[in-house]
Swiss-Prot record:
Lineage, top ranks: Bacteria, Bacillati, Cyanobacteriota, Cyanophyceae, Nostocales
Entry's transmembrane regions: none
Gene: coaD
Protein name: Phosphopantetheine adenylyltransferase
GO molecular function, one term: ATP binding
Organism: Nostoc punctiforme (strain ATCC 29133 / PCC 73102)
Top enzyme class: transferase
Annotated pathway: Cofactor biosynthesis; coenzyme A biosynthesis; CoA from (R)-pantothenate: step 4/5
Gene3D superfamilies: HUPs (3.40.50.620)
Length: 183
């Protein structure tokens, strides 16, 4: 059985990758499908995202990476997929995803939506959270693969926050601070 895991993946996170890995154990093939959405201004181009995802999933032989535009169900039919794979982080995700699943069912009765609960450690994680943290100079090293973290830091002209080798907690780089003393 072929499953499509659609999304913008801008950027792909460890939460997405956890879902892909788990899906790859459930389905014969998982196609990670990057949506080309002309109405959004992404951090990374579709081509960059495809390459980032390929590097992140190269150890999974039954995972393929592709891009598409238009309706997800049309793409799924074109790829002969029977399942749309979706992750659920919270109840709010469920409401939106359930509506989408019902809508997709009205468009194609041949395609089922399968929901996987996000692993606890990624239940808060989204691409927008990663972008927001990085934009303000925070460490995202624990949220995305290393090669993607570097790409993101470059987009925001930040260096990777230095890690304390003892505690592995992010330590902000020291800044030159001049202190004036009263005489």
């Amino acid at each position: 059985m072929i499953a499509i895991y659609p999304g913008s993946f801008d950027p792909i996170t460890l939460g997405h990758l956890d879902l892909i890995q788990r899906g790859s154990r459930l389905f014969e093939r998982v196609i990670v499908a990057v949506l080309r959405n002309p109405n959004k201004t992404p951090l990374f181009s579709v081509q960059q995202r495809l390459e980032q995802i390929r590097l992140s999933t190269q150890h999974l032989p039954n995972v393929e990476v592709d891009s598409f535009d238009g309706l997800t169900v049309n793409y799924a039919q074109m790829r002969h997929a029977q399942v749309l794979l979706r992750g659920l982080r919270a109840v709010s995700d469920f409401e939106v995803e359930l509506q989408m699943a019902h809508t997709n069912k009205t468009l194609s009765t041949q395609i089922e939506t399968v929901f996987l609960a996000t692993s606890n450690e990624y239940s808060f994680l989204s691409s927008s959270v990663v972008r927001e943290i990085a934009r303000f100079g925070g460490s995202i090293d624990h949220l995305v693969p290393p090669h993607i973290a570097l790409d993101i830091y470059q987009c925001y002209n930040h260096n990777s926050p230095m890690l304390n080798p003892i505690s592995t907690e992010a330590i902000p780089p020291l800044k030159n601070i001049s202190v004036e003393r009263e005489a």
